Amino acid sequence: MFSDRFEQLVQALRILPSVGPKSAQRMALHLLMKNREGAFGLAHALHEASSHIHECKICHSLTENEICDICLSNDRDQHLLCVVESPADVMAIEQSGSFRGKYHVLGGHLSPLDGIGPEEIGIPYLIQRLSSGEIEEVILATNATVEGQATAHYLLEATKHLPVHMTRIAQGVPQGGELEYVDSHTLSQAVHNRMKMK
């Protein structure tokens, strides 16, 4: 319609979740017509973040360093590990102020129909991490979706041979809901009222 560069911008914006062609077009027009300075700021911030933020070598959350501050902290409970699907879940739990242990980010959930098995979300690495003997309790805080529940169940079965106490965050997180959209109070209650699984 306008130019190849405009279409490239629209297509680039469509990689964002829940952004369809119309939304991407509206965003592109807004950036170019009403907020060109904001567009340059956005491009710079995106470049900086993409260049300097990567996965923590231990927990797989996001960090600017090789190892994130949470993994490096001696003030956190070294024996308590919370397993989540994404860095957004770490942010949500941290904002609730209800957890003082360490994290492990799977980077997704099991979905055999989509070709996502245990290897694709790093479950062997998690089991290796649990085998070190330092972790005493694991809180499974995968989403309350069918896939999240299946992932939690798989982890429970895969760790039966380990001397680790497995718990699941209490329901209170809506069925079918994702942690990053749950309010802090509900999430805090869910962490405090976690259930024994093993």
From Swiss-Prot:
InterPro entries: DNA_Rcmb_RecR, Rcmb_RecR, Rcmb_RecR_Znf, TOPRIM_dom, TOPRIM_RecR. Residues 79-174 form the Toprim domain. Keywords: DNA damage, DNA recombination, DNA repair, Metal-binding, Zinc, Zinc-finger. CDD domains: TOPRIM_recR. One of its GO terms (biological process) is DNA repair. A zinc finger (C4-type) spans 56-71. GO terms for molecular function: DNA binding; zinc ion binding. SUPFAM superfamilies: Recombination protein RecR (SSF111304). It comes from the Bacteria. Pfam families: RecR_C, RecR_HhH, RecR_ZnF, Toprim_4. Belongs to the RecR family. May play a role in DNA repair. It seems to be involved in an RecBC-independent recombinational process of DNA repair. It may act with RecF and RecO. PANTHER family: RECOMBINATION PROTEIN RECR (PTHR30446:SF0). This is Recombination protein RecR.
